[in-house]
Amino acid sequence: MLFRSGPRKSWASGDATARAMQLALLTMRGEMGYPTALSAKTWGFSDVLYNGRPLKVTRPYGSHVIENVQFKIAYPAQRHSQTAAECAVRLNPLVKDRLDDIARVELTTHKPALLKIVVDGPLPNFAARDHCLQYVVAVGLIFGDITTASYEDGFAADPRIDRLRAQMVVREDRTYTRDYDGPRQSNHNAVQVFFKDGSRTPKVDVEFLIGDARRRKEAMPLLDRKSTRLNSSHVALS
């Protein structure tokens, strides 16, 4: 998976959305359009990608996507690791002074996370690090926060991070996977730390990331602060 983690990995969705907006604006200005882009024989979308089957939409076109967009607010990390990051940060006060006493860290997640962001071994760049579930959790447990600086080479050189990664056991909970794929569309993760003396932390689990539509009330103040902070470096805000 590491060869897929470079600085351009996050461009695809933004580029596709920009192109969609461009086409929408052209349409509103009277662009004639191409009515057989989907249905044209041989070279149409349906023939090329769907083996001739027509494109079917699961819901009417409208505002569903905008109303249910998931904001990446609390932590700069791959979407599937967002709830795990929140679990780790919550556990930081119980763990930060006992790092040398840790026997293992158990991570419970869903199958998409297992396939996409569970990575063992070296992480060669910042893009690989923010796409590694174990790295994100290790930083949260050790430092109690995760920022863009957490992925830089100097920060990643802290030996405690890889040492803690090596102590992690990741397993799938099929209920989490079912709820991820099903109507709930949740992003469930859980973290629990076990110590050498036999004691353990509570198992902390979070089902929906803070940027999910179901957590809008607590997310909006954070989103406002993030927007203000990012924009203030480019424009003067009164």
Residue map of PLM features:
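Terminal-appendage/accessory-domain detector
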Residues: 4-18, 25-238
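Extracellular interaction modules
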Residues: 1
